[in-house]
Regions:
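Active-site groove signature of glycoside hydrolases
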Residues: 1
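Hydrophobic targeting/anchoring helices
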Residues: 11-170
Length: 170
């Protein structure tokens, strides 16, 4: 890949968007493999807790959790790609997007057992670092539980009904 000609240690990750799964002609996993060069491909999926508060595409928190799980299910397990969830709480003050939404989202995806992590956006882009400490406080409070979930559920298979959604419908 071209990135290797600049620096073979540079790692490029892909942030998914909705259209990449259906009508862009290439999905995030394929793009990540193409751009990774000699490094491990990295994908941050799309679907964030702030969607629930804003009712983006009329989604509630449980819909967004299942959207990310569906996107993760499209990854071929033979592919060695690091996959992160989008833990965005834009625009970040708790009165807009409760910290509980971020923690519930993180908890559910850890219990899924197939994510390599979550990119938690816990700081406001423009405000003082003391402006909104609750996201970080809740994250720290839940650390022991998060670690236990990762150990207890990591690598296990979900059972039950799986609604099949085709990739690349257009």
């Amino acid at each position: 890949a071209a990135v290797d000609s600049v620096d073979p240690n540079v790692r490029i990750g892909i942030c998914s968007c909705i259209s990449v799964w259906d009508n862009d002609g290439v999905d995030s996993y394929t793009l990540a493999k193409l751009l990774a060069g000699g490094t491990k491909p990295l994908v941050r999926l799309i679907g964030a807790p702030y969607w629930a508060e804003n009712r983006f595409l009329d989604n509630r928190l449980e819909d967004i959790i299942e959207l990310e799980r569906m996107e993760r299910s499209w990854k071929d397990d033979k592919d060695d790609i690091e996959v992160f969830a989008e833990g965005d709480t834009y625009p970040r003050p708790r009165y807009r997007v409760p910290s509980s939404y971020l923690e519930i989202f993180d908890t559910a995806l850890r219990a899924d057992g197939h994510f390599d992590g979550i990119l938690k956006y816990m700081r406001d882009y423009n405000a003082s670092s003391a402006y909104e400490p609750e996201y970080l406080r809740r994250h720290a409070e839940n650390k022991v539980y998060s670690e236990a979930l990762s150990v207890d559920f990591g690598g296990k298979e979900a059972v039950g009904i799986r609604v099949y959604e085709a990739l690349h419908k257009l």
